Amino acid sequence: MEKFYKVGTIVNTQGLQGEVRVMPSTDFAQERFSKGSVLALFDDKDNYIQDLKVKSGRPQKNFYVVKFEGFYHINDVEKYKGYIVKIAEENQEDLDDGEFYYHEIIGSDVYENDILIGQISEILQPGANDVWVVKRKGKRDLLLPYIPPVILNVDVNQHRVDVSIMEGLDD
């Protein structure tokens, strides 16, 4: 069975011409939502619906405005609010050393000084840097900015991330 990875969520419609607003959950939003990109649509219960080919896409604030081929009116896309767009594993490109996909990071164990502190549960994109959410037992989630002084090493094969928690991050 083919594997798919989430690249965004359709959060609303845009205008009357069948465009949708997609909240991206990928570092490669410009590539994923560019003309010709093929994505898969899944409903809110993670059931595959159909493949979609991007006709156009443009960033707007914190989301992308995307038009898919074959959808010409708001009525064609309104039912897809809350649906997920994913990319097939076979359509992912190989990355350079030191680069990784979100799905390779989420679920990784996080260590500081070889002591397990939690697991990465989510990656946020609030602005200049991604923020990795670390779920910890008995403590509130830890938010770590993806910057060199904090994220020391990422081993996607071992699902391990080594960090140095700077003063003020764990108050």
UniProtKB/Swiss-Prot annotation:
- Stored InterPro entries: PRC-brl_dom, PRC_barrel-like_sf, RimM, RimM_N, RimM_N_sf, Transl_B-barrel_sf
Q: Where is the protein found, in the record's own terms?
A: Cytoplasm
Q: Which domain of life is it from?
A: Bacteria
Q: Name one GO biological process term.
A: ribosomal small subunit biogenesis
Q: Using the record's annotation, list all stretches that form the PRC barrel domain.
A: 97-169
Q: Which GO terms describe its cellular component?
A: cytoplasm; ribosome
Record's keyword terms, sorted: Chaperone, Cytoplasm, Ribosome biogenesis, rRNA processing
Q: Does the keyword Lipid biosynthesis apply?
A: no
Which SUPFAM superfamilies does this UniProt record tie to the protein? Answer: PRC-barrel domain, Translation proteins
Q: What is this protein called?
A: Ribosome maturation factor RimM
Give the classification, highest ranks: Bacteria, Bacillati, Bacillota, Bacilli, Lactobacillales
Gene coding for it: rimM
